[in-house]
Amino acid sequence: MNNHKKLGILLANLGTPQAPTSQAVKAFLSQFLHDQRVVDMSRWLWCPLLHGIILPTRSPKVAKLYQSIWMDEGSPLMVYSRRQRDKLAELSQRPVELGMTYGEPSLLEGVRKLQQQGVEQIVVLPLYPQYSATTTAAVFDGLAKALRQLPVVPELHFIRDYHDHPLYIQALAKSVRASWQQHGQGDLLLCSYHGIPKRYAQNGDIYPEHCLKTTELLAQALGLPQDKVMMTYQSQFGKEEWLQPYTDKTMEALPRQGIKKLDVICPAFSVDCLETLEEIAEQNQEIFLHSGGEAFHYVPCLNDSQSHIELMAALVKVDC
């Protein structure tokens, strides 16, 4: 990239509803579930199902879940994302803006804010360590669509993934060790990743390979033998088969296998959100304890930790 042109950073993530209300959640889910990267069914079949059944029934339920985790400053995903933006800007001494694939601030808004600061080159960092067409590629699609609305298109550099970056693995290991120091080490470290339909992987999505590599490297960094770490997939919906083993089913089975104290980390999530704070730290903890488990400790996402910000700065610096 041209070093004489001002460079800025766009941190991209999935997005979040604007408020923990049925109306706001419905608007967010509608945009999210309309993306063919997320659901690749025929639009003739999917859209009537989405608008006739899924959105009317799921939106009020999901809104209640958001209410249980909502912070004074807003949605956890947005709160931590803003902190990441501010800390990365301070560390890198470059303009940094947020762009969400769905919801606000949009990818287009993020690019425009950077251009208003005189930025001509943008490094796009999707905060998905493991590549998937359902997440990372959706950022690229959304950005390409956004650029059509700009009179001047900036020079762009995309960071596709960082699932095996040494600083990423070190940051994960540090967070696990901090949990062990506070709560003691459990019988097993379970790495729960957001799932995707199995068919997507069979059609070439490399996401499961990236998840496996991250898990292996994290186990090595922690000095854990193979029988002390496990990988599962969460957040599946619909009747189609998703990547397995499923996190919730595993929670039911582990106590019967002698696992009474469990540590859980979600390496695919760069910030805590509904899927980590509610689905894992609340729902799945309840499943594990109800099934005979004795202790469940959720290891928070990297969020705006110093090690995470240093990782981001390194990713941007190396790829410029």
Swiss-Prot record:
Which family would the database say this protein is a member of?
Belongs to the ferrochelatase family.
Q: What does this protein do?
A: Catalyzes the ferrous insertion into protoporphyrin IX.
In Swiss-Prot or TrEMBL terms, this protein is called: Ferrochelatase
The places in or outside the cell where this protein is found are: Cytoplasm
| Major localization class | cytoplasm
Which amino acid positions bind Fe cation, per UniProt?
H194, E275
The enzyme's E.C. designation: 4.98.1.1
Q: Which residues form a coiled coil?
A: none
**InterPro entries given in the database record:** Ferrochelatase (IPR001015), Ferrochelatase_AS (IPR019772), Ferrochelatase_C (IPR033644), Ferrochelatase_N (IPR033659)
The cellular component terms of Gene Ontology attached to this UniProt record, alphabetical and capped at eight, are: cytoplasm
Q: Which reaction does it catalyse?
A: heme b + 2 H(+) = protoporphyrin IX + Fe(2+)
- Which domain of life does the protein's organism represent? Bacteria
Pfam families assigned: Ferrochelatase
Q: In which pathway does it act?
A: Porphyrin-containing compound metabolism; protoheme biosynthesis; protoheme from protoporphyrin-IX: step 1/1
